[in-house]
UniProtKB/Swiss-Prot annotation:
The record marks C156 as: May be catalytically important. Converts GTP to 7,8-dihydroneopterin triphosphate. It comes from Pseudomonas syringae pv. tomato (strain ATCC BAA-871 / DC3000). Pathway: Cofactor biosynthesis; 7,8-dihydroneopterin triphosphate biosynthesis; 7,8-dihydroneopterin triphosphate from GTP: step 1/1. InterPro entries: GTP_cyclohydrolase_FolE2, GTP_cyclohydrolase_FolE2/MptA. This is GTP cyclohydrolase FolE2. It holds the Pfam family GCHY-1. The gene is folE2. Keywords: Hydrolase. It is an enzyme of class 3 (hydrolase). GO terms for molecular function: GTP cyclohydrolase I activity. GO terms for biological process: tetrahydrofolate biosynthetic process.
Amino acid sequence: MNSPLPDVALTEVSSALIALDWVGMQGVEVPLTLGEQGATHPVHAYADLQVDLTDPSVKGIHMSRLYRLLDGFAEHQVLTPETLSALLEAMVESHVDCHSSGARITLTFNLLCRRPALVTEGLSGWKSYPVKLEAVWRAGRLCLDVSADITYSSTCPCSAALSRQLLEEAFVARFGRQSFVDPMQVAAWLRENASYATPHSQRSVATVQVRVAEQATEMGLMALIDTVEQALGTPVQTAVKRADEQAFARLNGQNLMYVEDAARKIQQALEGRYPASSVSVRHFESLHPHDAAAQTSSYLS
C-alpha cells in the first residue's frame, strides 16, 4: 500500500507567526549560457534563489520547485535580463499557495575571455573576471544589478616623484660640473642608472557595480569591464613578450594613480551610462603591510 508522503510545510503552522523577507537556497551549482557579446563558453555559476514568505501562518516554502525551475532554465535558456525576469516571475507563481509576491536571484561566476597582448600581433591569453548578478522581481518589475572585479596595476605618484628626485640628484652629481654634456654619454649613463630608484607599484582591484537599465536586452558585462579598463589604462595582462612588457611599463608611467585617482577615473567613465553605480577600489600596497581603499557611488535623478 502506497501512503501519501507527508508535507508538513502545508499541514503544519509555524509556532512563531512571523513573516520572512526571503527563504530559499544558497550556493546551488549550475551551468549557464550567457546572452552576452564575447561570451562564447558556458559558465560554472553558483545561484542563491529565494521567494518572500509574507504570510506568517505558512510554515515553509517548496525549495524543490525553485531548484527545478533553475535547472530547467539552465538547460533551455540563455541568460538575459528578459529570461531572468521570466524565471523570477515563475518562482513567484510556483509559490502562489504560500502567498509569495517577490523573488530574487544572486548569480556568481567567473567570466573568462581572451585578451590580446599590447603589442605582439597574434598573441593573446585568457583572463578571468569574477562577476555577480543580483536580481529582484516584485510587482511585475525587474531590478537588476551587475558587478565585476577588474584587476589592474597602480603606480604611486608620490613614490614616482621621490624616485625622479633621486635620479635627478644622481644625474647632477655625475654631469653637473660639465659645461657640455655628450648626448650619447648621457644615454649610456641612463641605461645603467635610470633605475637608480624606482616607484612602488602593485596589483589592484576595482569592484564595480551598476544598475542595468530596464529596457536593456543584455547585462552588458564586457562593455562594463572594457569601460573600466580603458578608464584606468593599466589592466593586468595575460600573455606577454618583452615588447608587451615594455609597453605595459610605459602605460604605468603614463597613468600614475593614488587609490583616490582610480576611484574617480572609474566613476567619471560610468557617469550617464547607468541608472546607478558604485565603485570600490583596493590597492594591495607594496610599501605597507596594509591596503589603500576608496569608494564612491552615483545615482541618476
